[in-house]
Regions:
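Short catalytic helix/loop segments, enriched in acidic residues and glycine
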Residues: 1-10
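Residues at the starts of beta-strands that form the adenosine-phosphate
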Residues: 18-19, 115
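Short internal beta-strands
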Residues: 20-24
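Glycine-rich loop at the start of a catalytic domain that most often binds anionic cofactors/ligands
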Residues: 28-41
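Short, well-ordered, mixed-charge alpha-helical segments that flank or form enzyme active sites
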Residues: 29-32, 72-77, 124-129
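Divalent-metal (Mg2+/Mn2+/Ca2+)-assisted nucleotide/phosphate chemistry catalytic cores
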Residues: 39-43, 50-119, 137-138
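Active-site rim beta-loop-alpha module in soluble metabolic enzymes
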Residues: 111-116, 120-123, 127-168
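C-terminal accessory domains and tails appended to enzymatic cores
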Residues: 158-242
Length: 242
């Protein structure tokens, strides 16, 4: 992971990027080896961030890059496919659009006027993202053989592909567009089990619309994103047996 992040940094610099922030976002959000990062890069690390994978976003950034992403829950041949948490979330829709982590996070960046420039991962997530954002450069570093198996590039080959693509993506940034959902906004979550929806509907603003489905209406996307983050965390409490 650290090598691929460093490759993206080096490529972005070659393309003209001057300031870079890394938000460590996989699993417990403590994966990136800081001593392998350039001295002038800022690193956001640690779990339970208020805005999770999108912590640190704000006005002033030229673009975002998603490194090491995966397919959404339920996608065939998506390597380790899930949407934030496989234990609790089966499907997420915003305004009727089925969303992966990449789409959910890209829309948060889009709220601040930041376009997604690059995504790396398996073919399934690359095709999912570019179908919604054709200006995004997708770097396919592995082909899924199933949920737990993949035909992958070597780390050296993957890093070269990421480095080259990141450089070009920064150069092409003026052609990219922020990804957004038009208001009014509706979030729908299908949980893995009905008991998780039992917990989520306890929160103000959520409506139960099905056995495993809840709905939340909002005025802007940050409200949608915060509601989603709260939902998967509270819904996860249903997985704990006292």
């Amino acid at each position: 992971m650290s090598r691929e992040v460093r490759a993206a940094i080096d490529g972005a610099r070659k393309g003209g990027a001057s300031e870079i922030v890394v938000n460590d976002s996989h699993w417990d959000m403590r994966n990136v080896l800081w001593d392998e990062m350039p001295a002038d890069v800022r690193v956001i690390s640690g779990g339970r961030k208020p805005l999770s994978m999108t912590q640190g976003l704000g006005e002033g950034f030229t673009g975002a890059m998603f490194i090491g992403y995966h397919a959404k829950a339920g996608d065939r041949n998506g390597v380790l496919g899930h949407t934030y948490t496989g234990e609790t979330i089966y499907n997420v829709r915003v305004n009727g659009v089925e969303c992966s982590e990449a789409l959910l996070n890209a829309a948060m960046a889009g709220y601040y006027g930041i376009p997604l420039l690059l995504v790396t991962g398996d073919r399934v997530v690359a095709e999912h993202v570019t179908a919604h954002m054709p200006w995004v450069t997708g770097v396919v570093v592995k082909e899924g053989i199933g949920h737990y198996a993949a035909d992958s590039m070597t780390p050296e080959a993957a890093c070269k592909a990421i480095r080259d693509a990141a450089a070009q993506a920064v150069k092409d940034a003026p052609k990219a567009k922020p990804f957004t959902f038009d208001p009014p906004l509706t979030l729908e979550i299908d949980t893995t089990h009905a008991e998780q929806a039992d917990f989520i509907e306890l929160m103000p603003g959520y409506q139960r619309t099905g056995g495993r489905t809840v709905r939340f209406d909002a005025r802007d996307y940050p409200e949608i994103f915060r509601a989603f983050t709260a939902a998967f965390r509270l819904g996860g409490a249903a997985n704990v047996r006292a």
